[in-house]
């Protein structure tokens, strides 16, 4: 296992460093994958879909902090394509183990919310309608929402709202309260922002296949890579999630896990 910081050199409007989109684009363009399950959105409500080209990936570049039933598409995908990838949270990756997948990309996750809940939080705490949101993030212990307000005749101004995540964590999905996996340990590669500087992704490389792909991407100038990850920051969040083992009841977990909806 190897920890890296990575950033795309492509012009991608991504959540952080654009690594995941660049990785998937490379895999689709070079025959490593035929299709990949990713998540777009309709007014920030997650919509899982199957992407077969780099262009189709562009609708999936931002984080959505609401439940998405990604794995519903896996049966169709694996029946119709030979080399299938999955991008998802730790619970999606766990559920995806029952399928023959070529590449599993796991995303760091502390907690997730139902769509109506996140919509209400944004409206009640910030006075913002969901359709005004330009970006959401959970970072450094805070839930952060960005909007773009009109300024002048043709300009816009970014407005940032934030609250401590502790103030809303009790509103999260029930399955998140017993989940013990922060970094998607069953994935081939795990991606997030914790442990890297702003504008970069933290990448946990979990097998040689992914290591070889990343080396190829770096050699071709598609990504910039460095080994300056704050591993302790990742381990801190992993340990917090592991505390859920004390209350974890397997039957309850699989009953409410969003990957199995």
UniProtKB/Swiss-Prot annotation:
Classification lineage: Archaea, Methanobacteriati, Methanobacteriota, Methanomada group, Methanococci
Family to which the UniProt record says this protein belongs: Belongs to the FrhB family.
Highest taxon in the source lineage: Archaea
Protein name: Uncharacterized protein MJ0725
GO molecular function annotations of the record: iron-sulfur cluster binding; metal ion binding; oxidoreductase activity, acting on CH or CH2 groups, with an iron-sulfur protein as acceptor
UniProtKB keywords: Iron, Iron-sulfur, Metal-binding
Parts forming coiled coils: none
């Amino acid at each position: 296992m190897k920890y890296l910081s990575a950033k795309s050199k492509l012009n991608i409007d991504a959540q952080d460093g654009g690594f995941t989109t660049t990785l998937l684009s490379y895999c689709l363009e070079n025959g490593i994958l035929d299709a990949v399950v990713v998540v777009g959105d309709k007014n920030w409500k997650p919509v899982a879909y199957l992407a077969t080209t780099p262009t189709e990936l562009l609708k999936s570049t931002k984080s959505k902090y609401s439940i998405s039933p990604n794995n519903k598409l896996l049966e169709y995908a694996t029946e119709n394509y030979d080399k299938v990838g999955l991008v998802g949270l730790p619970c999606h990756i766990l559920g995806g183990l029952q399928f023959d997948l070529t590449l599993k990309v796991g995303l760091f996750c502390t907690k997730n919310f139902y769509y109506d809940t996140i919509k209400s939080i944004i409206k009640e705490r910030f006075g913002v309608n969901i359709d005004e949101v330009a970006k959401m993030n959970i970072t450094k212990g805070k839930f952060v929402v960005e909007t773009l307000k009109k300024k002048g005749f043709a300009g816009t101004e970014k407005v940032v709202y934030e609250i401590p995540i502790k103030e809303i964590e009790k509103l999260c999905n029930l399955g998140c309260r017993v989940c013990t996996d922060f970094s998607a340990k069953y994935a081939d590669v795990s991606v997030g922002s914790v442990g890297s500087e702003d504008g970069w992704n933290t990448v946990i490389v979990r097998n040689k296949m992914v290591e070889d792909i990343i080396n190829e991407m770096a050699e071709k100038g598609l990504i910039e890579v460095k080994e300056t990850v704050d591993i302790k920051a990742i381990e801190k969040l992993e340990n917090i999630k592991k505390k859920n083992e004390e209350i974890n009841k397997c039957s309850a977990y699989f009953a409410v896990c969003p990957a199995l909806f």
